[in-house]
């Protein structure tokens, strides 16, 4: 069991290091009045809270970028009500992607993520 946990931890570290590398690179590329990162939305996360039990509550996600000013950033959110479909629907809406139907079991947008009035 410890060996498997160690392997998963190494894979997760590699993946988050790659995500951090991309965020840093995009933050250094000028675009318009800001940076490429200011105008993008990047998502990193896991589909499982606990891989052994395959639980899907309290999923860990990191969102980078400001979505052209549509995302309310720079915070840690916990106890946000919603599901993974709600998160994806919200991010796509912030990016200006029209959806003809909800993603998965989405029922709403997550208001804590969107800049008021955007």
Q: PLM ranges: what are they?
A:
Residues 1-118:
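Ligand-binding pockets and gating/stacking loops
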């Amino acid at each position: 069991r410890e060996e498997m946990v160690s392997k998963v931890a190494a894979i997760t570290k590699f993946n988050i290091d790659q995500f951090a590398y991309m965020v840093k690179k995009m933050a250094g590329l000028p675009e318009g009045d800001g940076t490429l990162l200011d105008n993008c939305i990047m998502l990193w996360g896991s589909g499982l809270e606990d891989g052994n039990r395959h639980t899907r509550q309290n999923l860990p996600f990191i969102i980078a970028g400001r979505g052209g000013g549509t995302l309310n950033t720079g915070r840690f959110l916990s106890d946000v009500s919603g599901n993974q479909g709600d998160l994806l629907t919200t991010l796509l809406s912030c990016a200006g992607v029209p959806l003809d139907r909800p993603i998965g079991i989405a029922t709403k947008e997550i208001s804590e993520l969107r800049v008021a009035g955007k």
